[in-house]
Amino acid sequence: MTTAPRAEKLTLFLAEDEEGTAILLKFLLERGGYTVVHAADGQQAQTMIDQMPPPALVLLDIMLPYLNGLQLLAHIRQKAEWQHVPIIMLTADSNERDIEQALAAGANDYMVKPFNPRELTARLQRFIKVAS
């Protein structure tokens, strides 16, 4: 994952409970020059979201313990200061109903796991450019 040099690192928020996926994503994103804040479950993610400034982008797993990704998405979209933050939903299965619900609730995009690192990079760069 390569990105253009920046004066400061952009922060991305990752909510992912599957340890292997979280480690891989953090590695790819940090190697790409981003700072990654990670939550391992929905409850932890909600607490962190309530305490941190808005990141450049959110990667949000749909199937999280305690609060699922759709519940977190609704929580994020209710926060005025997070309204502009792009959100990419991550899903292990391409359940059309979940994807439609996520997009209708305010997600900007979704990716089905496993995903191609180059595709992830392209989507991140597209949304971060649009948001800035």
Which residues make up each language-model segment?
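The feature encodes the CheY-like receiver
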Residues: P65, Q83, N95, K113-P114
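Acidic, metal-coordinating helix/loop segments flanking the phosphotransfer/catalytic sites
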Residues: H38-L57
